[in-house]
Amino acid sequence: MFYKIAQKFMFQMDPELAHNLAIGSLKSTGNSPLNCFYAQNIKPAPVTMMGLTFPNPVGLAAGMDKDGECIDAFHAMGFGHIEVGTVTPRPQPGNDKPRCFRLKPAKAIINRMGFNNKGVDNLVENLKAVKTNAMVGVNIGKNKDTPVEQGKDDYLICMDKVYPYAAYIAVNISSPNTPGLRSLQYGDLLDDLLGSLKQKQKELAEKHGKYVPIALKIAPDLSSEEIEKIAEALIKSEFDAAIATNTTLTRDGVSGLLNANEAGGLSGKPLNSLSTIVIKQLADCLKGKLPIIGVGGINAAEDALDKLDAGAEMVQIFSGFIYQGPKLIKDIVEAYRIK
């Protein structure tokens, strides 16, 4: 009820302004009695994946809390895990505004944010300040001005810094809003990146005395052959998981709507079936050797169950969470428990 009132007010505003306002209020109330406005008591429905046990299978996708400012607040809502980021080695402003657009009739969003974040050192301070036992994944990326050929170095810098504080690390090579980034999903660049990250993980596990799993986040705009090659590379490098999928450059299901022609990645309801298809194809190629976190267009509990049926072990929500509110977390966990 409270969310519907807040949403009505927020949806009158520019999407990015509304987002910043929400993050600000969650940041200030996460550990106060005021979190009663959004806190939920969700009965555990544990999932073991990547050697970790999550309290339930519903996570918050990266991009909502880029700088890890509201981890305790999202934990209070009942998320089984919270993926913060995407974070880069150095702070960067992202692309020019406006860069985020609602497509309300389609329950969709188009964004071209461009990895705006306050940098990895700032994120680390926020991770150190977390007061709850939230499971936090950290999504890492490269700075816009780092050449793609040297992109690997940015991922290694971020991995080194967040490793002691992350439950897992997600490697984002699939945002459509950083020029050239998606080229890291192919061939030698991919093999080199995965191999280097895996080597770094071994060194860091020894140094810190703990193993932090690494997952690769992929795009939905891939051919069957490309998905197969990525799966082979993941198996070969012994990565711990895949996250499928990021936003899409396609505009299926939104053509003719206000803002549909804006550049950027489309998320929300229209992405649901495409991302589920990619999960199914990826699962078929991985043959159970790596688990999958399914994300993209989940707007109701049934959408989440479809992704689990397609081969995902857990799910994440973002746009559906904006349109439906915290109740969506509870709905999915309840449906999962019944299933």
Curated annotation (Swiss-Prot):
Q: Membrane: is it a keyword of this entry?
A: yes
- SUPFAM superfamilies attached to this UniProt entry: FMN-linked oxidoreductases
| Catalysed reaction, written as an equation | (S)-dihydroorotate + a quinone = orotate + a quinol
**What's a single GO BP term from this record?**
'de novo' pyrimidine nucleobase biosynthetic process
Q: Where in the cell is it found?
A: Cell membrane
Note on how the cofactor is bound: Binds 1 FMN per subunit.
State the annotated membrane topology for this chain.
Peripheral membrane protein
Pathway(s) per entry:
Pyrimidine metabolism; UMP biosynthesis via de novo pathway; orotate from (S)-dihydroorotate (quinone route): step 1/1
Sites where the protein binds substrate = K66, N111, R112, M113, G114, F115, N172, N177, N246, T247
Q: Where is coiled-coil annotated?
A: none
At the top level, the lineage of the source is: Bacteria
Its principal location? membrane
Alphabetical list of InterPro entries matching this protein: Aldolase_TIM (IPR013785), DHO_dehydrogenase (IPR050074), Dihydroorotate_DH_1_2 (IPR012135), Dihydroorotate_DH_2 (IPR005719), Dihydroorotate_DH_cat (IPR005720), Dihydroorotate_DH_CS (IPR001295)
Q: What does this protein do?
A: Catalyzes the conversion of dihydroorotate to orotate with quinone as electron acceptor.
HAMAP family attached to this UniProt entry: DHO_dh_type2
Task: Return the protein name.
Answer: Dihydroorotate dehydrogenase (quinone)
